[in-house]
Amino acid sequence: MTVTDLVPVNEDDPGGSNGSQWGRAQVLVKYNTADNPNIVVNEYIANRIAIALGIPTPLGDLWFDPSAGEPAWVVAEIGEPGNHFPPPQEAALRSIPEKTRALMEAFDALIYNTDRHEENILADNDGHAWVVDHDGALFGDIKDDRATGLLSTKDRTDYDPMGFWGNLPATSAARERAIAHIREGKGVIGWASTT
């Protein structure tokens, strides 16, 4: 998360003293649209699942925007303001540890994210990576009753139509461990113990 404009906290402010400071954070704000009325719920649920499973993703939350009259999705920016991660090169993607890649792929299958590509995975050359942009996952752009819409898609199997994970494969053993991790609902500690 990027934080700017630091201001010291006064003795009587919430948060105390001891060198505390107030700051401004850079966030991305997303709203539902007529074409996709599920952006906010898709992002929120996918983010919470990723965090619970220990999958690297920037922290996000709901924000009730009074001017819009409905909740919006806000997510912390990674990097410096105005200096966003470019789409990672293949070398950066391959530097992501195999077990992390396998877990990210299993996560995409779980939430039925058919929109994974190099522009919505942030990666550097040191193996650090974060999955972002899940507005088309889960409920997709279902415009009717979400429960009925989900039932109509229960037999879908191709979560990687763009071939992103096929071009960045993990071994079958790593995939099996990632799938077991997700099925067991383990977080970061559970995954670390299965290496």
What spans do the regions from the language model cover?
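AlphaC helix of the protein kinase catalytic domain
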Residues: F85-A91
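C-terminal catalytic region of ATP-dependent kinase domains
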Residues: H128-T195
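Short, low-complexity, polar/charged sequence segments that are solvent-exposed and flexible
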Residues: N47-I51, A92-I96, G149-T153
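Conserved ATP-binding subdomain of kinase catalytic cores across diverse folds
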Residues: M1-F85, F107-N113
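Conserved kinase catalytic-core segment
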Residues: A91-K143
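Glycine-rich loops and low-complexity Gly/Arg-rich segments
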Residues: A52-I55, G82-N83, E98-T100, K154-D158
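Noncatalytic linker/hinge segments flanking ATPase motor cores
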Residues: S67-A68, N113-I121, A170-A174
